[in-house]
């Protein structure tokens, strides 16, 4: 990217989203918006989009990308667990079952706003209490929607993913890259 271009402002505190965008070669400036993520009475997919929009609108800049990921178990949102016990409960509920992961993004360019929601279906394998205790003990799931990270130790919990794996991680990278590229914002 030419030196005269502004950076891509990531309206997210997610180290995973930042790392994904940096892996593509984009210079990133993180601006964590002060947006409350709890309490919106919306269905899971609509909630992901509303939160991404709120985050994006809360940050100034020419090129702004915000995203939010929501884990949807039979229409119920499983957010970030409050503590290890709630993480344990989430994993027990997900064990041996499929669920949906909705990742929404809000991309503001100098000329337009693009908003999309991408969904993947995740299948957990049946988990023993010992496996759940091992994963909860790692602490990895405490800052992640649904209480697990598919790209880290949580990969051991998954049977398979239908759809884009990066949607589960927190950003449909290929789609975001294509949108930025088509608008002349290149690494």
Curated annotation (Swiss-Prot):
Keywords: Cytoplasm, Hydrolase, Nucleotide metabolism. InterPro entries: ITPase-like_fam, Maf-like. The keyword Zinc does not apply. Its EC number is 3.6.1.9. It is an enzyme of class 3 (hydrolase). Coiled coil: none annotated. GO terms for molecular function: dTTP diphosphatase activity; UTP diphosphatase activity. It comes from the Bacteria. GO terms for cellular component: cytoplasm. Its cofactor is a divalent metal cation. The record marks 16, 69, 151 as: Important for substrate specificity. It catalyses: dTTP + H2O = dTMP + diphosphate + H(+); UTP + H2O = UMP + diphosphate + H(+). One of its GO terms (biological process) is nucleotide metabolic process. The keyword Cytoplasm applies. It is found in: Cytoplasm. Gene3D superfamilies: 3.90.950.10. SUPFAM superfamilies: ITPase-like. Nucleoside triphosphate pyrophosphatase that hydrolyzes dTTP and UTP. May have a dual role in cell division arrest and in preventing the incorporation of modified nucleotides into cellular nucleic acids. Belongs to the Maf family. YhdE subfamily. This is dTTP/UTP pyrophosphatase. The lineage of its organism: Bacteria, Thermotogati, Deinococcota, Deinococci, Thermales.
């Amino acid at each position: 990217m030419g030196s005269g271009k502004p950076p891509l402002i990531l309206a997210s505190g997610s180290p995973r989203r930042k790392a994904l965008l940096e892996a593509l070669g984009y210079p990133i400036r993180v601006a964590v918006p002060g947006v409350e993520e709890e309490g919106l009475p919306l269905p899971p997919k609509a909630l992901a989009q509303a939160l991404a929009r709120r985050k994006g609108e809360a940050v100034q800049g020419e090129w702004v990308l915000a995203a939010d990921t929501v884990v949807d178990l039979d229409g119920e949102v499983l957010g970030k667990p409050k503590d290890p016990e709630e993480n344990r409960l989430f994993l027990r509920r997900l064990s041996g079952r499929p669920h949906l992961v909705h990742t929404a993004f809000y991309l503001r360019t100098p000329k337009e706003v693009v908003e999309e929601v991408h969904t993947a279906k995740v299948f957990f394998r049946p988990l023993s209490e010992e496996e759940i205790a091992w994963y909860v003990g790692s602490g990895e799931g405490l800052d992640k929607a649904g209480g697990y990270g598919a790209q880290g130790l949580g990969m051991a919990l998954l049977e398979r993913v239908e759809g884009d794996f990066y949607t589960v991680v927190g950003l449909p990278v290929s789609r975001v890259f294509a949108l930025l590229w088509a608008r002349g914002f290149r690494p």
